[in-house]
């Protein structure tokens, strides 16, 4: 989206960056969850990912921080009236994200940690759907009611 918008307009604006930054972070969080799940295998095969460099515990803390940053980013722009307040409904996705982080903190087997992948992907999807619902609600809500 950002590349297309930049190609068409020759500029990047906050209107495009406000939703794009959390999207990018959440997609990266899915990939980071995969790295955390495969930590032992990746380390044994000499892979040098951010998670390997930080360690399992550090990577898990960073993952939780990324989810929290996404919600804080959305809240900041909602409270500064850059996006409608109703998009804060997307914060519900944080609950699902933290379930995945808790599973990764347990450092059980990879089968158990597969659930963390599910929760990470689900929270990303939920965030985007609820953010979109919030935008649509703010646009059409007054017109329908």
Language-model features and meaning:
Residues 28-51:
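Acidic (Asp/Glu-rich) catalytic motifs at the cytosolic membrane interface
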Residues 41-45, 62, 131:
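Active-site-proximal flexible loops/turns
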Residues 1-29, 53-57, 63-145:
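Hydrophobic alpha-helical transmembrane segments
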């Amino acid at each position: 989206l950002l590349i297309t918008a930049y190609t068409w307009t020759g500029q990047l604006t906050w209107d495009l960056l406000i939703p794009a930054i959390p999207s990018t972070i959440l997609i990266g969080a899915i990939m980071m969850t995969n790295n955390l799940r495969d930590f032992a295998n990746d380390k044994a095969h000499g892979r040098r990912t951010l998670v390997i460099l930080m360690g399992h515990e550090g990577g898990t803390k960073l993952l939780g921080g990324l989810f929290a940053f996404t919600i804080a980013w959305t809240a900041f722009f909602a409270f500064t009236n850059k996006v409608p307040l109703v998009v804060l409904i997307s914060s519900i996705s944080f609950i699902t994200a933290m379930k995945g982080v808790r599973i990764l903190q347990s450092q059980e087997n990879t089968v158990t940690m597969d659930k963390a992948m599910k929760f990470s992907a689900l929270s990303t999807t939920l965030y985007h759907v609820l953010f979109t619902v919030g935008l649509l609600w703010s646009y059409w809500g007054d017109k329908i009611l």
